[in-house]
From Swiss-Prot:
The lineage of its organism: Bacteria, Pseudomonadati, Chlorobiota, Chlorobiia, Chlorobiales. This is UvrABC system protein B. Belongs to the UvrB family. The beta-hairpin motif is involved in DNA binding. Pfam families: Helicase_C (PF00271), ResIII (PF04851), UVR (PF02151), UvrB (PF12344), UvrB_inter (PF17757). One of its GO terms (molecular function) is DNA binding. The UvrABC repair system catalyzes the recognition and processing of DNA lesions. A damage recognition complex composed of 2 UvrA and 2 UvrB subunits scans DNA for abnormalities. Upon binding of the UvrA(2)B(2) complex to a putative damaged site, the DNA wraps around one UvrB monomer. DNA wrap is dependent on ATP binding by UvrB and probably causes local melting of the DNA helix, facilitating insertion of UvrB beta-hairpin between the DNA strands. Then UvrB probes one DNA strand for the presence of a lesion. Residues 641-676 form the UVR domain. Residues 30-419 form the Helicase ATP-binding domain. GO terms for biological process: nucleotide-excision repair; SOS response. A motif (Beta-hairpin) lies at residues 96-119. Its main location: cytoplasm.
Length: 681
């Protein structure tokens, strides 16, 4: 619980930079030191872009924001960077919604859609941990984020001012401390407190900080803090004594009572002006609607210090003038930080598009009396604001976009040679006629030599149909689509990497950045259908998924050689020639990238978040003697079956006590373990 202020990165890796990496590291580091605002790293798949950037980070020793365009890749980057920097603060900041339906109004149908959401508690904890690390004074902080980082947050100054600082032996009134906790949105739970909750037992307060997994025990003696101890909330095991403790707010929108009163007065004034305008235009329905909703929110703020949708009043709470950019995660970084934009050809356009969609939806809400005009200032950054805020940027992509190339002055740092000596996979064009039978035969060949395959279709329906066809043909197959939750996507990728499935079918979910060295075959159906998913950049990205395997091979099913296909063939030939020449000059024999099961589990570790939450919720963890299905591979058959019997007894007991959700969970665990044990036996 102590506040660390280490300022040095410690890069941990058994490897040394090789191939093009030393030259790229030197160029990027020098560019930052020379004050270059934008740089672009053009790195082919498997060239070690993450390792290269990790070396740059370690040499520059600055706080870093790493941006990715989706949660799956952010999770992978988070896992990899935690491996490279196990002794530093590597944090994770993505949207904490498992499901999110934004508030909206459809005038043509006169239909209001209320905001509906489901928050993932584990990701909320990781977000709070990220902001806590940034405000802790540490310099060795890496935050891996999606575009969530450009959306509004509470003020870092206000958030920092609310931090409760404790020290063993300090004077502190117990009741005053409890009131402070409640003002930081902590909730009392005297049974089994979880993240953001506390319990009181006489002069002892047990608290689970919102950004921590471990709990803090504060023992009072009169008006003095007698001791601070870190302990496991599940087992009660004391893990150590602390001299200091810092308790951060449980929510990211906080304001002290005085500022909240000022904000409420400003909201009242804006409401009065808006009501006068609506009534003068004879829009009485909108006026009544706005007054009812706003006064209800004000009453909630008065009584609780918080209301649902309080972020829509963030302009008043932070005291910003109308139209000023929102406060966001970038404001939590110190001045000397730098930004790394992964897969920049996708991430930068995504940042550019966020503002327009948000503005369009909220304008309708304001016009029809669902929100005050100030709600328009609860928004993501405009792209121009983002560019003004980022001090120095390194863009990473195998296929950089026009914007980053322009910003970098047309210069790129190239990573074409892989440390493993692997060449870009050969690309072959085959006719569409008979493509499914041909593809099935190709898949079976690659599975027979212990490899995996990715198959890309044009539509979700085609993916589903192809998935069903492969399953009937005896192929262990899964498909990814946009409705699968981010953490579940990571779990599916883990299944592919761990050998539970052999083929993944998808549309647009497997292109950028996925680290899948087991994949040796990439098949692209309808490759000659020119468009967003079949242009040069997309085809190069998809083909790159096979570039981490010595037997990598790409098949394009097409009847016409389009301009995009020809450019892919030409660029692949150019890169292969450079790579082959380098290997010959340095006596390098190409080899596949190999990762252990432990590395697979570590790099996809965020996918465990939901599972850990469920296990904690049902009291299934931690128990030293319990090893559930995710770890059954490490058991002897005798011990495995003994654990299954124990789980079966717990399942029956849970059913008898009508704890049906727990019983169903245990049933699924038993089934998974039996499958693993049967496979190994």
């Amino acid at each position: 619980m102590e506040n660390r202020t280490d300022n040095e990165y410690q890069l941990v890796s058994p490897y040394q930079p090789a191939g093009d990496q030393p030259k790229a590291i030197e160029a990027l580091v020098q560019g930052v030191r020379d004050g270059r605002h934008w740089q672009t790293l053009l790195g082919v798949t498997g060239s070690g872009k993450t390792f290269t950037i990790s070396n740059v980070i370690a040499q520059l020793n600055r706080p870093v924001l790493v941006m990715s365009h989706n949660k799956t890749l952010a999770a992978q980057l988070y896992g990899e960077l935690k491996q490279f920097f196990p002794h530093n603060a590597v944090e994770y900041f993505i949207s904490y919604y498992d499901f999110y339906q934004p508030e909206a109004y459809l005038p043509s149908l006169d239909k209001y859609i209320a905001k509906d959401l489901r928050i993932n508690d584990e990701i909320e904890r990781l977000r709070l941990r990220a902001t806590s690390a940034l405000l802790s004074g540490r310099k060795d902080v890496i935050v891996v984020s999606s575009v969530s980082c450009i959306y509004g947050l509470g003020s870092p100054e206000e958030w920092k001012a609310q931090i409760i600082k404790l020290r063993a032996g300090m004077e502190k009134d117990r009741d005053e401390f409890l009131r402070e906790l409640i003002s930081l949105h902590y909730l009392r739970d005297d049974v089994q407190p979880t993240s953001g909750r506390f319990r009181v037992r006489g002069d002892t307060i047990d608290l689970v900080p919102a950004h921590e997994e471990l709990a803090l025990r504060i023992e009072f003696f009169g008006s003095e803090i007698e001791s601070l101890q870190t302990f496991d909330i599940q087992t009660g095991e004391i893990l150590g004594d602390d001299e200091y403790a810092f308790i951060y707010p449980a929510r990211q929108f906080v304001a002290d009572e005085e500022k909240l009163q000022v904000a409420m007065l400003a909201i009242e004034n804006e409401l009065a002006g808006r009501l006068n305008l609506l009534r003068s235009e004879n829009r009485f329905v909108e006026a009544r609607r706005l007054e009812e909703r706003t006064r209800y929110d004000l009453e909630m703020m008065k009584e609780l210090g918080y209301c649902s949708g309080i972020e829509n009043y963030s302009r008043h709470i932070s005291g910003r003038p109308a139209g000023e950019r929102p406060i966001c995660l970038l404001d939590y970084f110190p001045e000397d930080y730098m930004v790394v934009v992964d897969e920049s050809h996708v991430t930068l356009p995504q940042i550019r598009g966020m503002y327009g969609g948000d503005r369009s939806r909220k304008t309708v809400l304001v016009e029809h009396g669902f929100r005050l005009p100030s709600a328009l200032d609860n928004r993501p950054l405009r792209f121009e604001e983002y560019e003004e805020m980022v001090p120095q940027v390194i863009c990473i992509s195998a296929t950089p976009g026009e914007h980053e190339l322009m910003r970098s002055g047309g210069e790129v740092v190239e990573l074409l040679v892989r440390p493993t000596g692997l060449l870009d996979p050969p690309v072959e064009v085959r006719p569409v006629k008979g493509q499914i039978d041909n593809l099935l035969a190709e898949i079976r060949h690659h599975i027979s030599i212990g490899h995996k395959a990715l198959v890309m279709t044009l539509t979700k329906r085609m993916s589903e149909d192809l998935h069903d066809f492969f399953r009937k043909a005896g192929i262990r197959c899964r498909y990814l689509h946009s409705e699968i939750k981010s953490l579940e996507r990571m779990q599916i990728l883990r299944e592919l990497r761990a050998g539970d499935i052999d083929v993944l079918v998808g549309v647009n979910l497997l292109r950028e950045g996925l680290d899948l060295p087991e994949v040796s075959l990439v098949a692209i159906l309808d490759a000659d259908k020119e468009g967003f998913l079949r242009n040069t950049r997309s085809l190069m990205q998809i083909a790159g998924r096979a570039a981490r395997n010595l037997d990598g091979f790409v098949v394009l099913y097409a009847d016409v050689i389009t301009r995009s296909i020809q450019e892919v063939l030409d660029e692949t030939a150019r890169r292969r020639a450079i790579q082959q020449r380098y290997n010959e000059e340095h006596g390098i024999t190409p080899r596949s990238i190999v990762k252990s099961v432990d590395q697979i589990l570590d790099t996809t570790g965020v996918a465990d978040a939901e599972e850990r939450y469920r296990r904690r919720r049902f009291g299934l963890e931690p128990k030293p003697e319990r090893v559930l299905s995710g770890y059954a591979d490490n058991l002897t058959p005798e011990k495995g079956y003994a654990i299954v019997e124990g789980l079966r007894l717990e399942m029956q007991e849970a059913a008898e006590h009508m704890e049906y959700e727990k019983a169903a969970y245990l049933r699924d665990e038993i089934t998974k373990m039996e499958q693993v044990l049967k496979k190994d036996g």
